[in-house]
Amino acid sequence: MARVTLVLRYAARSDRGLVRANNEDSVYAGARLLALADGMGGHAAGEVASQLVIAALAHLDDDEPGGDLLAKLDAAVRAGNSAIAAQVEMEPDLEGMGTTLTAILFAGNRLGLVHIGDSRGYLLRDGELTQITKDDTFVQTLVDEGRITPEEAHSHPQRSLIMRALTGHEVEPTLTMREARAGDRYLLCSDGLSDPVSDETILEALQIPEVAESAHRLIELALRGGGPDNVTVVVADVVDYDYGQTQPILAGAVSGDDDQLTLPNTAAGRASAISQRKEIVKRVPPQADTFSRPRWSGRRLAFVVALVTVLMTAGLLIGRAIIRSNYYVADYAGSVSIMRGIQGSLLGMSLHQPYLMGCLSPRNELSQISYGQSGGPLDCHLMKLEDLRPPERAQVRAGLPAGTLDDAIGQLRELAANSLLPPCPAPRATSPPGRPAPPTTSETTEPNVTSSPASPSPTTSAPAPTGTTPAIPTSASPAAPASPPTPWPVTSSPTMAALPPPPPQPGIDCRAAA
């Protein structure tokens, strides 16, 4: 019986979405390697982190990986994490950037899987869809503890709070080995797909036979769901052909291209189209026959101008109402704040403004104060970005998912309850200047024989001579002081005090007390 050769047939797609200004996802799909990274950190930092990690894994896509697949994946992930740390050291402004990672290294009938963060891996086998990764998120811990159901987690306001990611700091990814079978279909996706699209709908799209059409359909579904985030997918089939694909596919931030699908006819799609549209002015040469131009009557022209004015005014009022009813948690001037509006700007004007700021009492109780109050005297400590742990700090810097004011207040309370660094200890008391602390010793000393009354010296017991010459004591001389008496051997055990540990650093392993 001939040996069956298993190969991959794959497709990858990435889209910026309808809300984000740039694409921070990066994806690589090749004959041996499928890898997807969802960057975070705001501005260009997320793009940098995801590109560095994908670049560190790309060399695994060789002709025959063989050997220990998990060891190779682990080494490549650590190299990518070290690259992030080195980049932050060169550019301190990138501190807080990070990325998720879900990757598969394929070798015949087996594959290695590495995962960290909230990007996901799915397996479609025999018509059944199974999630093969576990989200490293705060909401997933609530599900594990039985506090909420998986259905409630799907719409939980804190679903984007990541507990583990590649940020340049030491972290252990999840590594597993799996068996590959002919007919299996694997899906890697960012949370831009799994958040707005249900598993049932994902299953329907994955049942499309062609991998490219299936990937295209998944992106389309995410955009129709509002496209709140970058969305990236890899769809790969395990097939028993003699030859599979060999040309790798790059998409997202790592490709340098802005892959955008035709925007859906939804409110979010139309809003995104308005922000992206660029006017192209074409020069039209003058026509020779100017008399053939239709002439509009003054009444019709006035009607058109009035109609356009009404529509523009209505659009502005509706847009203003939508913006003013939207709230999200983000960094503002170094403080964790609730912002009103949406991220970004239009024609040079900011579309958001600070609304409330978190304030911590000495007993660590959270209250919200208006932005106008933050400039005056306070009986609480403003909740600073540096008070948060690094993963949550990166999330807030990028901006948490928007919603109602109650949603944003809930996010703020969740951060105060679960994401703060421990308070810095009070400074140690020091000795006053000029009074050094005495050394700590333990001694056993025998007295000198000259000081013992039980053994008087013969010279001191003789009577003093009489005469004009004054007696000179044998124990002292005015010209030269007597040397100190020689003691018996002394046993000394000095106790060396241990050096105190280095003090915690605010913003790194502790926060300033309220």
Swiss-Prot record:
Cofactor binding description: Binds 3 Mn(2+) ions per subunit. The third manganese ion is unlikely to be involved in catalysis but contributes instead to stabilize a flap segment, which is partially disordered in the absence of bound metal.
Annotated TM spans: 303-323
Regulation of its activity: Activity is modulated by phosphorylation. Phosphorylated phosphatase is more active than its unphosphorylated equivalent. Inhibited partially by NaF and cyclosporine. Also inhibited by zinc ions and inorganic phosphate.
GO cellular component: membrane; peptidoglycan-based cell wall; plasma membrane
Residue(s) carrying Phosphothreonine: T137, T141, T174, T290
Enzyme Commission number(s): 3.1.3.16
Positions on the Extracellular side per record topology: 324-514
Names of the cofactor(s): Mn(2+)
Reported consequences of knocking out the gene: Depletion of PstP compromises mycobacterial growth and causes marginal elongation of cells. Depletion of PstP in M.tuberculosis negatively impacts its survival in mice and decreases the bacillary load even in an established infection.
Additional remark text: Overexpression leads to elongated cells and partially compromised survival. Was identified as a high-confidence drug target.
Assembly and interaction partners: 78 interactors between PstP and Mtb proteins were identified using Mtb proteome microarray, including proteins involved in diverse aspects of cellular pathways and biological processes, which contain cellular metabolic process, biosynthetic process, gene expression and transcription regulation processes. Interacts with EthR and may interfere with its DNA binding activity.
The name this protein goes by in its record: Serine/threonine protein phosphatase PstP
Taxonomic lineage: Bacteria, Bacillati, Actinomycetota, Actinomycetes, Mycobacteriales
Gene name per UniProt: pstP
